[in-house]
Structure formats: C-alpha cells, structure tokens
Amino acid sequence: MLLQEFKKNITFSDLTFELISSFEYFLQLKGYHTNTIAKHMKHLKRHVNIAINKEYIEIQKYAFRKYKIKTIENKHTHLVPEELERLENLILSGRYVKLQKSLDAFLFCCYAGMRYSDFINLSSENFVDINQETWLIYKSVKTGTEVRLPLYLLFSGKGIAILNKYRDNLEDFFHLRDNSNVNKDLIIITRLAGLSKRISFHTARHTNATLLIYNGINITTVQKLLGHKSVKTTQVYTNVMDMTIIHDLEKMK
C-alpha cells in the first residue's frame, strides 16, 4: 500500500493535515497524475471518516477539514485510426518485448471498450459461443451492469485475434501489473510507435467509443456496448458526432 510505503506503522493520531499534505507530495514525486492522487486521497478520507464514526479519531482533529482534494478536468483522450494502426503494427524487440502484454491488453480494450478494472477481472468463462460466434459477457466492476459484446463484429474481430495469441494461457493475459505501471508501459510504447500523444489505459475505452460513433454506430448502441446505465453518460462523446457529420457530408462532394 502506498501509504505504508510513505510511512510505516501509521496510527490514527498520525493522520494530521501535515501528514496528508506530505503524502500528497510523496505521490507527486512518484509521478502520479493529479486525478490519480485524488483517488488515493478519497480512499484515505473514506477510512478516516470510518475512524471518526467509530470514535478512533476526535472530530476536532479531522485532517480533511483543512485539506482539499484536488482534481483537474479530464479530457477524453482517444486515438484516431492512424494512431491505432501504428500501435497495431508496432513490433517490440529486445528489451521492449516485455511490454507486449501491456500493448496487447490495451489494444484488446480498444476493440472491446473495457476499463482496466473489468479487464483484469476477466476469465475464460466470460467468453461464450453463441450461434458459433464469440461473445464477451461480463459484469462491470464499477456499475454492476452486465455487458454483452459480439467480439466477432467489433473492429473486424481483432479482439478475437489477440485472444488467440494467448489461448494456451488466457488467464495469465488478464493478470496485468497495477494500473500505474501499465500506464508507464504505454508511455514507452507510444514513444516507440512515434506517437506524441500521452495516453493511459483508459484511453482504450475512449478510443473504442469515439471510433464507433465516428463510424456511424447509434449512440444508444454505444451506450450498451460500454455498459453505461444512462445514455447521458455516453453523450460526453457528442463532440465526435460533429466530426461524423463532417465526415458524412464530405462524401457528398
């Protein structure tokens, strides 16, 4: 746990404003994104709140009264088809071969629109043959929504091709390192592919939604494929619809 790495044997009395501020600085030095730090702080705050409710900490000493969790607005970074193709065609060799699983997992999630948390919870049981075609059926860790994906129809079945690479040890494919380390792998991978765009694993999900909408897939269908409970959540991609309109009208020239 990062907090224990920062300071071993922490007691409730140690959880002061000064310690939390120092922990934030520690995470910054480790290179964590502002919003990633915010996730760790929210997790810590939740435990502090429980401790206060159980009277392990006096309410007067509530550290988060002064400390404000900082976040920045996330832009939905996505890859355009040409950038995705560069990653698909990237050949890793030498000391970079060890990055292959991170690359393949990222590409698979570009085709399936999955979150990191859902990908690492997959097993072979999530893949089902329906009418002799491969479907991926899973329950979202974040929302609890069941998602049903016809992999054979998504992105020309490229996700199935990746699964076939790992068919002898499929469970290992889903056992990635932690999200932050995989994101570090992706920074190296994009540099090797000649891409200047900074991506994270979640970029795969945004890429999936963006390219589906750009290629004319109905937003309600995209909502179902992403496992969004409400179409309003999917409408963050409406800026892509403008691109789609331009794309369609240019065909008429």
Features from the language model and the residues they span:
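Short, basic (Lys/Arg/His-rich) helix/loop patches that form interaction surfaces
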Residues: 94-96, 167-172, 176, 184-224
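Basic, Lys/Arg- and aromatic-enriched nucleic-acid-binding interface segment
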Residues: 34, 38, 57-116
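C-terminal catalytic core of Y-nucleophile DNA break-rejoin enzymes
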Residues: 73, 141-188
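Catalytic-site neighborhood detector that most strongly recognizes the C-terminal catalytic loop/helix
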Residues: 78, 140-144, 226, 230-251
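N-terminal DNA-binding recognition helix of tyrosine site-specific recombinases/integrases
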Residues: 2, 29-63, 117
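C-terminal catalytic core of tyrosine-transesterase DNA break-rejoin enzymes
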Residues: 107, 111, 118, 205-229, ...
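Short, polar N-cap/turn motifs at the start of nucleic acid-interacting alpha helices
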Residues: 127-133, 196-197, 217-236, 243
